[in-house]
Amino acid sequence: MGIKYQKIGDVVIVKKELSEDEIREIVKRTKCKAILLYTTQITGEFRTPHVKILYGKETETIHKEYGCLFKLDVAKIMWSQGNIEERKRMAFISNENEVVVDMFAGIGYFTIPLAKYSKPKLVYAIEKNPTAYHYLCENIKLNKLNNVIPILADNRDVELKDVADRVIMGYVHKTHKFLDKTFEFLKDRGVIHYHETVAEKIMYERPIERLKFYAEKNGYKLIDYEVRKIKKYAPGVWHVVVDAKFERI
């Protein structure tokens, strides 16, 4: 059977309509409780999927990845399989001396593995979508974490200054527009994990130019960086992350 599908917990996502036979085959093969068709691209600021339920009713599930539990409603919340390596990398990027700010926490995609395995002093996990925030709080409990403070807010309205050794910017729509706030969060020295979607031909230039521009504007200088590819986003366009080190001038 050549049907492409993605399994999140015990819910399956497909990208095209299925026949009754195909539905039966997937249910038999995966033991899933629901099959969802993602009808259009994920849209809007809150990254909400547009879905049609092809089988079952219950779309809330618990997905296990890398020893972490993620509760989510797959009909309401996006789960990106393409970011799995980055979630693993973030798990061990920090240490117990750090304070981390996750500016776009979602349901805890990066916060949960990082808090669990790196054991930083504290993670401020900021999320403005109330549905995602609900699951973020659930996931903090599910994973028995006591070093995460969830904050329901637009990160630009959060009053935290000079607190972060590390800031995660895991969002790819005009991410640079949030950099002024990022430098407010950052201590005198720190690391920013800056995500962006960028045309392949300027992939190693544009993100760095943007980081340098906002650093200078906020009294910092870029001292070291590395650009990493996460996944192909569209033809000729990559989702990249820049690990960038800064210090205050």
Swiss-Prot record:
A single cellular component GO annotation: cytoplasm
Keyword tRNA processing carried by entry: yes
Principal cellular location given in the protein's record: cytoplasm
Pfam families referenced in this protein's UniProt entry, alphabetically: TRM5-TYW2_MTfase, TYW2_N_2
Gene Ontology biological-process annotations: tRNA methylation; tRNA modification
Residues bound to S-adenosyl-L-methionine: 80, 87, 127, 154-155
EC number from the UniProt entry: 2.5.1.114
Catalyzed reactions: 4-demethylwyosine(37) in tRNA(Phe) + S-adenosyl-L-methionine = 4-demethyl-7-[(3S)-3-amino-3-carboxypropyl]wyosine(37) in tRNA(Phe) + S-methyl-5'-thioadenosine + H(+)
Superkingdom classification of source: Archaea
Molecular function via GO: transferase activity, transferring alkyl or aryl (other than methyl) groups; tRNA 4-demethylwyosine alpha-amino-alpha-carboxypropyltransferase activity; tRNA methyltransferase activity
Xref: InterPro entries: MeTrfase_TRM5/TYW2, SAM-dependent_MTases_sf, TRM5-TYW2-like_MTfase, TRM5/TYW2-like_N, TYW2_archaea
Task of the protein: S-adenosyl-L-methionine-dependent transferase that acts as a component of the wyosine derivatives biosynthesis pathway. Catalyzes the transfer of the alpha-amino-alpha-carboxypropyl (acp) group from S-adenosyl-L-methionine to 4-demethylwyosine (imG-14), forming 7-aminocarboxypropyl-demethylwyosine (wybutosine-86) at position 37 of tRNA(Phe).
The family this protein is said to belong to: Belongs to the class I-like SAM-binding methyltransferase superfamily. TRM5/TYW2 family.
HAMAP family: TYW2_archaea
NCBIfam families named in the record: tRNAwyosineTaw2Meth
Stated name of the protein: tRNA(Phe) (4-demethylwyosine(37)-C(7)) aminocarboxypropyltransferase
Organism: Methanocaldococcus jannaschii (strain ATCC 43067 / DSM 2661 / JAL-1 / JCM 10045 / NBRC 100440)
Gene behind this protein: taw2
